[in-house]
Every structure is written in C-alpha cells, then in structure tokens.
Amino acid sequence: AAELKERLENMGADVDGIWAATFHSACVRILRQDIEELGMGYKSNFTIYDTDDQLKVIKTVMKEHNISDKAVTPKAVQNLISRSKDKLITPDKFSTKGKNGSDDYQLSTAKTIYTDYQARLEAANALDFDDIIMLTVKLFAHCPDVLSHWQNRFKYIMVDEYQDTNAAQYKLV
C-alpha cells in the first residue's frame, strides 16, 4: 500500500486524500470508527487475534467440549472457520450436512467449535483476521447511514489483482 502511494507521488499525483490500503487495513479503519453501530457489543478498541491466538482459543474450546484432536485437528478447524468467514458464513448458518446430504460428524463437531469460538471472541472484544472483512460487510448491509457515509467518502475504488478476491471481499467492494 505504501509502495503504491509512493509510485503515485512519483508520477506527480496529490496523494493526501488517497487511501492506499489492503482490504484488511481499510476495514480495520472503518471498524475502528463504526463497529459499535452493529449493536453486537463490540467496542472500537477491539483486539485482533493472530493465528496463534486463534489456535489457542480453538484448543481451549475443544478441550472444554472433550473433542479429541484425533477426530479433528485445531488447524483444520481454523482453516474451516476461515473459509466459512471468507464465504460470509456465520456459525448459525454453518451447515453440518456432508456431500451425501446427511449430518456429518466432523462438520457437526466443527460447528460446535465455531459457535463457541466466535462467542469467545465476541466476549473478549476480539476479531480474527477474517472477521475484519466479514463484519465490515455486515456493517454496511445493516447500517445504511454508515454505508452511505463511506460511499460518499470515495469517488473511486481500485482493487489490485481483483481476480484473487474471495466472496467476502467481492461483496465488500
């Protein structure tokens, strides 16, 4: 992002009003200002959990639910939660149905972990990396005044390597 701004400046552009940011850094900035509008209990001073923090919470949840890491590994659950959030799937929308349409033990177990994991993040006023985009999408969808404010803030949005965006990033733009 800084490199892009530097290139624009070298071309003679006035970069004072330009946001050059990753999806995540732009969304953090938006959430720091407006997350309380969601009414979910998050405060603007939220903490962002890294991969190690996420795994620690997942392992705690698994231990408290007596879920063996032989049945499902914490890393696999973390990846499943991340992929779900990339598709804007919240714990209550998470499907436990396997490919054959019947309940799948591993997916049911993952849903239990995902639900408790997310509750713990909310209780700690914490977001994981995937929440940053998912909650910004939710903020814009549920708070039209906030959406309008940010739409009016930007005349143009340029996305580098747009073909690599996931569903949540696509919805955000």
Name these PLM-found stretches.
Residues A1-Y156:
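A basic/glycine-biased coupling hinge at the interface between accessory DNA-binding modules
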Residues K5, Q169-Y170:
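Conserved strand-to-helix beginnings and helix N-cap segments that scaffold or border functional pockets
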Residues W150-Q169:
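SF2 helicase catalytic motif II
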